[in-house]
A protein has these predicted regions:
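C-terminal regulatory/interaction module of P-loop NTP-utilizing enzymes
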Residues: 1-411
Length: 411
């Protein structure tokens, strides 16, 4: 029997190609393969979210939803939606094709378009350019074939869309409504591609993992019922309120998420600042991180705890009360404490004066978040006027400035 090379087998249709960009219609050949759930999926999920503040139920719900179809992770800013999305992809052994939604998206950005290209020899050529969805599907098919030969390779590539509701989804996704809502191998027509390379079948192994900021939804585009029906929505919220009488400094591993958040913030800030300070000599990073962690847990701990007390008031404020509701995410707290620590170190602030630095950090990091908070001006004004130390200085002034400037949003 004569030797037949792999390229010949691909051309004869005996085996699928390893790159479908010029053979889009052959994706149908591998489209029926379902997602493989790793035997150690639970362990992989736990490993992937080790640094995230998530209740087990949220993780289990997201994993189950991904097994079935496309998902949207919704919640306030800074709660770890994007990190969870990446962690889920990692746990399922899928690489990601990340994009951020934009209000100007059209079907040309999502499906594809023709572009005029100027080559180095000054010749012009019209070339097809795949949109985000099309490119992600092709890459997913490529990954699936590679995974057949190399099981350690990703089994798929998934489209990760941040801030999904910033785009006009009905306008941008067009005929994708049909294929996202069925398990049937219905092809999408790609008008920007050449004849014979236009019919795209979405593999069963492909997923869209999207994030959605549920807090400022009044400032972005609402998702239609048609879009919502094609995704499972998983809420990623701030931690539940700490039990009454619990101390922020409780180091028990079984402590509630709100308490564990305090220690995660301290550790994350110490690590980030240490990396910045020792970038020219990484051998000193670990030592510096321990030093900063000790400082945050010691001399600076009172200021950090007062920040958490303030955040707790805002996060769990009751509707109609004298405290405005603002679901501040962990990421914003980390940013605030990092800025606080840097200022203390930079200015050589004495321990007796660090509270003023925390007040300043809150005024420039957290107060601007109220510019998009839906709160009656009288509530914001009363809250500012009744702030206690250390937030009765710069933080109060900035909040009252927002009230005076009319930059709040009234219900």
């Amino acid at each position: 029997m004569p030797n037949v090379d792999e390229e010949t087998l691909v051309e004869q249709g005996a085996i699928p190609p390893t790159d479908f960009h010029d053979k889009i219609e052959r994706i149908r050949e591998i489209s029926d393969y379902e997602i493989e759930a790793p035997e150690d999926l639970t362990a992989r999920l736990d490993q992937a979210i080790s640094g995230l503040l998530l209740p087990p139920e949220t993780l289990k719900a997201a994993a189950a939803a991904l097994r079935v179809g496309h998902i949207v992770l919704q919640g306030p800013p800074g709660t770890g939606k994007s990190s969870l999305a990446r962690a889920l992809c990692e746990a399922f052994n899928a690489s990601i094709f990340p994009v951020t939604a934009h209000e100007d998206w059209t079907v040309f950005d999502v499906i594809g378009r023709l572009e005029l290209r100027l080559h180095s020899d000054r010749k012009e050529e019209i070339v097809p350019v795949n949109g985000y969805f099309t490119e992600a599907v092709i890459r997913c098919a490529n990954a699936t074939v590679r995974h057949f030969d190399e099981p350690m390779e990703p089994q798929a590539e998934w489209l990760l869309i941040d801030e999904l509701n910033r785009a006009h989804m009905d306008r941008a996704f067009g005929e994708l409504f049909t294929v996202l809502g069925t398990d049937s191998a219905i092809p999408i027509t790609l008008p920007h591609q050449r004849d014979g390379n236009r019919n795209l079948v979405v593999p069963r192994r492909f997923r869209i993992v999207a994030t959605l900021n549920s807090f400022d939804r009044q400032f972005v585009n609402n998702l239609s019922q048609a879009i919502r029906r094609r995704f499972t929505f998983i809420s990623v919220n701030i931690p539940d309120k700490r039990p009454a009488g619990s101390m922020w400094t409780n180091a028990d591993a079984a402590a509630p998420l709100a308490i564990r958040e305090f220690h995660i913030v301290v550790n994350r800030v110490a690590s980030r600042v240490a990396n910045r300070l020792t970038s020219l000599d990484p051998t000193k990073t670990d030592e510096k991180s321990v030093e900063l962690r000790t400082k945050l847990s010691g001399a600076l701990s009172d200021s950090v705890q007062k920040l958490f007390d303030l955040v707790e008031q805002l996060r769990y404020a009751a509707s109609g009360g004298r405290v405005p509701h603002l679901p501040i995410g962990t990421a914003q707290i980390i940013d605030t404490v990092e800025l606080f620590l840097f200022r203390v170190l930079q200015d050589g602030v004495a321990d007796a004066n660090v509270a003023e630095v925390m007040d300043w950090a809150v005024s420039v990091k957290l107060v601007p978040l109220f510019d998009s908070d839906v709160v009656a001006p009288e509530v914001l004004k009363e809250f500012a006027e009744h702030l206690s130390a250390p937030f009765n200085g710069a933080t109060r002034r900035e909040l009252l400035g927002i009230v005076a400037a009319g930059m709040h949003f009234v219900e």
